[in-house]
């Protein structure tokens, strides 16, 4: 009986270890405007995840510096973290941004060099940023993306995502980011037809200017999409961090979006 208990405990521990938790967050103008106190708050919120995909990193030096500060703060929390930052996207000077990934090195290994999408960089204003990771002996590639605003019709660029699984047939793709578009939009149907699904359904993720009748979220923009034939969902969700603040105005100094997350294992 004791041997059976030990074996069960080992199997549970092994299963937990073999899972990966990814979090995606539009950190709104992530750069010099974020104070040390803000970066410390963000680090405390992210410390229990394995991989962080960040959108809206400022294209200038301040953006890269903020990511480095966040990684440094995470390294003070007990685990070793590394990070990578994209080149500025090829969009106009006003719209150009960077993306970033931060990950726990004892859990994940970065494979090869990350890259910005090349084939559709003219069709997609802020072309997505790819990075491949390995945990145990299996690999997956996160496609980090920030779409144009809703008024500019983000579906006109999201429509090119249906070509990406065929463009990268050997990669296990996860699409993560701020799509400025709900998962129910028909632009996602081609991906759904080949097995992709969203981690969140009908979940608003952007903050209003102020809460009305305890309703503080505005639009269903942020999500994570994955192929159900390649990934097993353990659990998924979002972090309503704004509830830790006295007002949305105060919460919005962190970001005008809430983070979304996905815990999974690979088939």
Where are these regions (language model features)?
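N-terminal, active-site-proximal structural segment of metallo-dependent hydrolase catalytic domains
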Residues: 2, 16-99, 155, 159, ...
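Sec-dependent signal peptide recognition
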Residues: 2-9
């Amino acid at each position: 009986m004791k041997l059976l208990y030990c074996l069960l405990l080992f199997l549970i521990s092994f299963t937990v270890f073999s899972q990966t938790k990814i979090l995606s967050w539009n950190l709104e103008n992530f750069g010099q405007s974020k104070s040390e106190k803000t970066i410390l708050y963000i680090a405390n919120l992210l410390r229990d995840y394995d991989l962080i995909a960040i959108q809206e990193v400022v294209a200038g030096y301040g953006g890269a510096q903020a990511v480095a500060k966040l990684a440094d703060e995470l390294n003070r929390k007990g685990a070793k973290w590394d990070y990578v930052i994209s080149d500025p996207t090829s969009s106009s000077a006003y719209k150009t941004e960077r993306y970033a990934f931060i990950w726990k090195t004892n859990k994940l290994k970065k494979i090869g060099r990350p890259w910005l999408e090349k084939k559709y960089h003219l069709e997609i204003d802020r072309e997505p940023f790819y990075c491949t990771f390995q945990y145990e002996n299996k690999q997956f590639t996160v496609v980090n993306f920030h779409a144009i605003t809703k008024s500019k019709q983000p579906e006109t660029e999201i429509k090119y995502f249906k070509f990406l699984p065929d463009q990268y047939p050997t990669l296990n793709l996860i699409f993560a980011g701020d799509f400025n578009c709900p998962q129910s939009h028909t632009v996602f149907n081609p991906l759904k037809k080949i097995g992709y699904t969203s981690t969140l359904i009908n979940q608003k993720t952007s903050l209003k200017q102020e809460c009305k009748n305890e309703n503080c979220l505005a639009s269903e923009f942020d999500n994570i999409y994955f192929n159900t034939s390649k990934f097993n969902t353990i659990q998924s969700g979002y972090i309503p961090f704004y509830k830790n603040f006295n007002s949305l105005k105060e919460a919005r100094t962190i970001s005008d979006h809430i983070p979304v997350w996905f815990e999974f294992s690979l088939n």
